[in-house]
């Protein structure tokens, strides 16, 4: 290494003293791509666990964990009638698990996978590049999708609300928002 100002090493490589007699092509090894695997579910999260959302539009809300999707995201719901959180996907890094559990018997989550939450993209109008508008067909499909979503939300919430009503104060607990004050120490709290 050559030394530069103030005695620091600079990235200059020396030429080797000896040269190979035969020029041989050195084999080029490609890196093996890692297979995408679903994120492992945290130990403290199990179906029926009440989670606190830490980021996003619903931060501070308490939700019920239903299942883990193939992508590794968590499927959660408020229930919507209690605290306004619909069926949604959440990354488990942005959740805080509590010791509270809800009985999920009768809740059917088989139809909910990652494609259920997909949307149709709006086509850009070539005349006006800044506005992307849905066609009439896409608008009809979107309204049908929204109506189906409402029915699915109701189908999940009905047995869930029945289970919530069985436990005293659980409905109020789910409806209340999670907050911290200045002197609170979250690492010492038990949720």
Curated annotation (Swiss-Prot):
<keyword id="KW-0687">Ribonucleoprotein</keyword>
<protein>
    <recommendedName>
        <fullName>Large ribosomal subunit protein eL6</fullName>
    </recommendedName>
</protein>
<dbReference type="GO" id="GO:0003723">
    <property type="term" value="F:RNA binding"/>
</dbReference>
<dbReference type="InterPro" id="IPR008991">
    <property type="entry name" value="Translation_prot_SH3-like_sf"/>
</dbReference>
<dbReference type="InterPro" id="IPR014722">
    <property type="entry name" value="Rib_uL2_dom2"/>
</dbReference>
<keyword id="KW-0689">Ribosomal protein</keyword>
<dbReference type="Pfam" id="PF01159">
    <property type="entry name" value="Ribosomal_L6e"/>
</dbReference>
<dbReference type="GO" id="GO:0022625">
    <property type="term" value="C:cytosolic large ribosomal subunit"/>
</dbReference>
<comment type="similarity">
    <text>Belongs to the eukaryotic ribosomal protein eL6 family.</text>
</comment>
<dbReference type="InterPro" id="IPR000915">
    <property type="entry name" value="60S_ribosomal_eL6"/>
</dbReference>
<dbReference type="GO" id="GO:0002181">
    <property type="term" value="P:cytoplasmic translation"/>
</dbReference>
<dbReference type="GO" id="GO:0003735">
    <property type="term" value="F:structural constituent of ribosome"/>
</dbReference>
<dbReference type="InterPro" id="IPR041997">
    <property type="entry name" value="Ribosomal_eL6_KOW"/>
</dbReference>
<dbReference type="GO" id="GO:0000027">
    <property type="term" value="P:ribosomal large subunit assembly"/>
</dbReference>
């Amino acid at each position: 290494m050559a030394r530069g100002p103030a005695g620091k090493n600079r990235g200059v490589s020396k030429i080797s003293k000896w040269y190979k007699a035969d020029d041989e092509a050195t084999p080029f090894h490609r890196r093996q791509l890692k297979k995408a695997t679903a994120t492992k579910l945290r130990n403290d999260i199990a179906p029926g666990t009440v989670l606190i959302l830490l980021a996003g539009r619903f931060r501070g809300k308490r939700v019920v964990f239903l299942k883990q999707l193939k992508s590794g995201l968590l499927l959660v719901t408020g229930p919507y009638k209690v605290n306004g959180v619909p069926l949604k996907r959440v990354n488990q890094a942005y959740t805080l698990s509590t010791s509270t559990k809800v009985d999920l018997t009768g809740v059917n989550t088989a139809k909910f996978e990652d494609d259920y939450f997909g949307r149709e993209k709006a086509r850009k109008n070539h005349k006006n590049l800044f506005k992307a508008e849905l066609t009439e067909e896409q608008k009809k499909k979107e309204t049908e999708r929204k109506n189906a979503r409402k029915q699915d939300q109701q189908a999940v919430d009905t047995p869930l609300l029945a289970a919530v009503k069985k436990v005293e104060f659980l409905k109020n607990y789910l409806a209340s928002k999670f907050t911290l004050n200045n002197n609170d120490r979250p690492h010492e709290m038990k949720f």
